[in-house]
């Protein structure tokens, strides 16, 4: 078992897809998102401000207000254990903004 987990590009993309689906038309979003990855679940609690172009409503920027990310790993006895991970909002931002 690892002491901490690496958040891969595919996990960032999965989080970005979930968040983008909830952002439609909003200027502020707060929620909890989960991505399963084998025997672990990565959770992200997130609050962001969504800046939009005045005329088109296109998302032009995002600002994180607060976030917390952790990984839940099932132990051999079936009990869940919280583990740290290397989540970086800048990488999620890139996935959300298509950069």
Report residues per predicted region.
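Beta-strand elements of well-folded, non-transmembrane domains
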Residues: 35-54, 69-71
């Amino acid at each position: 078992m690892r002491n901490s987990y690496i958040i891969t590009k595919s996990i960032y993309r999965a989080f970005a897809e979930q968040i983008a689906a909830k952002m439609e038309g909003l200027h502020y979003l707060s929620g909890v998102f989960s991505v399963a990855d084998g025997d672990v679940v990565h959770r992200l609690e997130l609050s962001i401000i969504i800046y939009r172009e005045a005329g088109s409503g296109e998302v032009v920027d995002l600002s994180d207000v607060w976030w917390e990310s952790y990984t839940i790993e099932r132990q051999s006895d079936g009990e869940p254990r919280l583990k740290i991970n290397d989540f970086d909002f800048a990488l999620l931002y890139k996935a959300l903004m298509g950069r």
